[in-house]
């Protein structure tokens, strides 16, 4: 019986070998070597970009807030001028993206997924082109990238989920050390090989960078905060990076172009459905970001602040100011009618909530976005027939 089983297994292995060898997604050995080298170059360049431009903080936010409110009290308008470290155009990274585009174009006709690298690199290079134009004073905002229909959907959601002012002093009793321990336990339970460390000088209370979860030393957390952060940050963002690395390509660790829609959408869905006590204002927060993303192209900063205060009268002036500032960081000059849209939370959640469990599991494991939804089976076959090893 064992002899028959061994023969059957050998036959199945042989049949799989024949099928894989005929796959249109199979790379020739030389192209696979080239792809792996380019993937590593991509990783190093993306890290340079992320190190410089991700999680940027406004260094003079309190000073600009005081100027803004003082002008407002005098019946005047003041448009904040933001100081942001490492926000200048980086010629070396820009040229590096250009060279990488040329190299991926050389294998595009032989490598199915080269187009996904190119899509992502072109998008990141465009962000740098915008910074260059802002530095040179030649930037033109163009048409509103957010549709009026999406704005109206988000505005309706704001009305259905009004803002409730949290009682932070009452609820936030957990120190950063307590959070570190609970995050480590959650990572162990999920099998995610990530470190957790406490940092000083962070603006957010918690963020994720590569294989590291960083917690703000001075922040305090409620029990609901911790539960929500595990669902959102760990089961969402960390999970997609972790499983992306298992594919064997950095492309999937960082996420394909448009993956941020699913990334934030899944994280929000987790925050609402994988916890016993969802945090207040989740739906308000994701919908108000979309409204602001549309309106910042239609009204000036001062009018937008007033609009937000009407929608959320219980929100503190400083919280409203920060909410309006956040998408404007890319411009630095808040007099410019544009910014970096933050629609991915609302759009992404509305996509993810309509998915079945299998699709949500797929977007967790393959880190795709809506642009690649209908190519997922092709991506799976490409990874299967080319036998990539998990990244370390």
Describe each model-derived feature in a short phrase.
Residues 2-152, 392:
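N-terminal low-structure segments adjacent to metalloprotease catalytic domains
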Residues 101-221:
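Contiguous, non-catalytic segments that form substrate-binding/exosite surfaces or channel walls
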Residues 138-142, 247-249, 282-283:
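Short, glycine/acidic-rich hinge or "gate" loops at secondary-structure transitions
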Residues 206-212, 239-243, 319-324:
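Active-site-adjacent bridging/hinge elements
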Residues 223-239:
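Short alpha-helix carrying the canonical HExxH Zn2+-binding catalytic motif
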Residues 281-392:
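Conserved alpha-helical "signature site"
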């Amino acid at each position: 019986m064992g002899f028959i089983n061994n023969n059957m297994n050998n036959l199945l292995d042989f049949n799989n070998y024949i099928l894989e060898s005929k796959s249109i997604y199979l790379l020739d050995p030389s192209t696979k070597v080239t792809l792996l080298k380019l993937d590593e170059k991509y990783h190093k360049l993306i890290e340079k970009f992320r190190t410089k431009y991700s999680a940027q903080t406004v260094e003079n936010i309190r000073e600009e807030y005081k100027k803004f409110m003082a002008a407002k009290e005098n019946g005047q308008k003041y448009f904040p001028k933001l100081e942001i470290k490492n926000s200048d155009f980086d010629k070396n990274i820009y040229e590096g993206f250009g060279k990488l585009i040329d190299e991926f174009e050389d294998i595009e006709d032989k490598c199915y997924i080269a187009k996904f690298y190119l899509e992502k690199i072109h998008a990141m290079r465009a962000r740098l082109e915008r910074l260059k134009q802002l530095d040179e004073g030649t930037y033109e905002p163009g048409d509103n990238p957010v549709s009026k229909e999406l704005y109206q959907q988000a505005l309706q959601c704001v009305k259905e989920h009004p803002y409730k002012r949290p009682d932070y002093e009452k609820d936030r009793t957990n120190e950063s050390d307590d959070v570190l321990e609970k995050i480590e336990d959650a990572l162990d339970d999920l099998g995610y090989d990530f470190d957790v460390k406490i940092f000083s000088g962070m603006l957010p209370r918690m963020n994720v960078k590569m294989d590291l979860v960083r917690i703000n030393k001075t922040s305090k957390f409620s029990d609901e905060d911790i539960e929500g952060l595990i669902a959102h940050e760990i089961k969402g963002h960390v999970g997609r990076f972790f499983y992306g690395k298992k594919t064997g390509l950095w492309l999937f660790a960082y996420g394909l172009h448009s993956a941020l829609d699913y990334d934030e959408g899944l994280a929000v869905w987790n925050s609402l459905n994988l916890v016993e006590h969802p945090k207040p204002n989740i739906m308000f927060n994701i919908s108000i970001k979309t409204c602001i993303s549309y309106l910042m192209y239609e009204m000036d900063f001062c009018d937008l602040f007033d609009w937000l205060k009407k929608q959320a009268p219980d929100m503190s002036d400083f919280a409203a100011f920060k909410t309006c500032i956040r998408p404007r960081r890319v411009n630095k000059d808040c007099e410019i009618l544009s910014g970096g849209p933050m629609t991915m939370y609302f759009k992404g959640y509305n996509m993810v909530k309509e998915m079945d469990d299998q699709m949500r599991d797929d977007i967790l494991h393959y880190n795709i976005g809506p642009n690649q939804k209908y190519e997922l089976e092709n991506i799976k076959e490409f990874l299967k027939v080319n036998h990539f090893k998990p990244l370390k």
